[in-house]
C-alpha cells in the first residue's frame, strides 16, 4: 500500500506544477484514452467527478488493453489526450514532427519482478528461466531488456520472455502456474496478485535496479496531448490538469488506511 500511495503522491506533485490558472467549467468534451494499468490510475475518478458536478470539464474516457489501439486514434485526431508508456510518447513525437507532446508525467518506477517461489534473489538467478511479462514494444520490455544486459545476461539467449497484451493476463497465468513461475508486473497488479496468492513475492524492484546502473530517473508513463489541440485550448488544458490533480488526490484518500488519532 505504501508503494501505491507513493506512486499517487508523485503524480500529484507533477500535475500540480502545471495545473495553474484553470477556468470555470466549460461545455468542451475532452476525448481521452488510457491503458488499463498504472498509467491511467490518476484518471479513473474523472467520470465520477463529472457526475457529481465537481469536474471542470466533460470527459469521454476510454480504456484500452494495448497501446496500438490508442495510437491511430490519437494521430487521426479522434482523441485529444492519452495516458501512454513514455517510450511510445517519444516515438509519436518523432513520427508526428511534434504533433503529439507530453503534458504530464503520470508514472515513475512501478515495475517489479515477482516469483511464485523462492529461487530468484538476483538477476543472475534469472538465467535459463522463463519470464512472463506485459508491454511488448513498450516501457516494460525496454526496461527489462536493458537491465538484463546491464547485469550480464543476453535477453535473447539467456532467458525466455513470454509477452501478454495485458497485465491481468500475466496475473492469471501466475495464479494458475506451478511453483517457481516468474513475471514482470507493474503496480497495482503486484499487490492485487499477492492478495490472491500469499506465495507470490517481489524479488526485484526494477526502479532500484535501474538506479544502480543509470543516472536518469525511470519514467514509465506520461499523459500526452495533440499539440494543435493544446495550442487552441489552453484554458481546457489548465482545467484538465486541475481535475487530474483532484482525481489523484481522491485516489490517495481511498488507498491510504485511516490511522488512529
Regions found by a protein language model. Give the residues of each.
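Short, low-complexity disordered leader/linker segments with a strong preference
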Residues: 1-29
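Generic alpha-helical secondary-structure signal
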Residues: 7, 73, 128-129, 173, ...
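A residue-level signal for beta-strand positions that form part of recognition/binding surfaces
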Residues: 29, 222, 257
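Pocket-lining segment of extracytoplasmic ligand-binding domains
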Residues: 87-88, 169-251
